[in-house]
Amino acid sequence: MVDRITPATTDTIRVSSADPMAVPTEAFREWVLEDNFAAPRPNWPDVQFVQDVRPHELRKLRILNGAHSFLAYAGLAQGYSYVHEAIADPYLRRRTKQLMMEAGATLPSDMRDQVPDYANALLARFGNVELAHRLDQIAMAGSQKLPYRFLETLRAGRGPIVAEAVRSWMEFCRVQTDQGRALNDPKALDIARAVRSKNPKIALLEVIGGADLAALILG
């Protein structure tokens, strides 16, 4: 499991760097590997070796990635362009923290004590102006991301803010479709058809495999 926020590169970075493959990134980095080597364990002092990497993957998917997606859809709806702008909004910051705590409650029990500190650290990381992490980049391919970032969380435990995040994606899809903007999503055509259907919310849930959660998400 690798955790390091890395926005898409820009023309400015390409021009200013001698490295043609340069990308922006943050100072923070976390690398977790399962201690399951055929040969002796490598001497990598910055790597965390664990028996099971899955809980760390869940923490990243449900808390970091989930919060990013929520900020993307809710932030774009408020007119923001970047993560640092959206997280500076008091309402979105509060809801994002609530989402993190909801998601954290669904993690394996031995990970839950870490959630408050992890969430607070993420809020600080999201406020990094220098990253200039675009919300529309995070919003791409929502049909592929939501099942892991939100739906699995909801199946693991009730979460009203996580459900709100799914509704934010639905509204994003509706607005983009109504305004004639092409969605950057491998299921863009299915999403557009769902938005124009007689029951768009249920149809959108069907696109992402979440129809079983309709009562929880839609209320």
Predicted regions and their residues:
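Substrate/ligand-engaging "lid" and interaction regions
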Residues: 1-219
